[in-house]
Amino acid sequence: MKQNIHPNYQPVVFMDTTTGFKFLTGSTKGSKETVEWEDGNTYPLIRVEISSDSHPFYTGRQKFQAADGRIARFEKKYGKQ
């Protein structure tokens, strides 16, 4: 492998700005803003608008719309025979 061409992979804290939920993970993204984590170490802080803590798919607050498929529309239009 070539030296000095790979991005710096480091631990960072992502914070969901909607709920305030934070989680520590590895990333190549950096930030000048830092936060002290539960283990006492300081890590770069990256703010995100949506995470698994606030996304409707993961929270179970998802709204489903009735979407008819082609067959259902055909049967509705011409009646099931």
UniProtKB/Swiss-Prot annotation:
UniProt key word Ribosomal protein: yes
Cellular-component GO terms for this entry: ribonucleoprotein complex; ribosome
Keywords recorded for this protein, A-Z: Ribonucleoprotein, Ribosomal protein
GO biological process: translation
GO molecular function terms noted in the UniProt entry: structural constituent of ribosome
PROSITE patterns in the cross-refs: RIBOSOMAL_L31 (PS01143)
Entries under InterPro entries matching the protein: Ribosomal_bL28/bL31-like_sf, Ribosomal_bL31, Ribosomal_bL31_B, Ribosomal_bL31_sf
Gene3D superfamilies (alphabetical): Ribosomal protein L31
NCBIfam families in alphabetical order: L31, PRK01678.1
Name assigned to this protein: Large ribosomal subunit protein bL31B
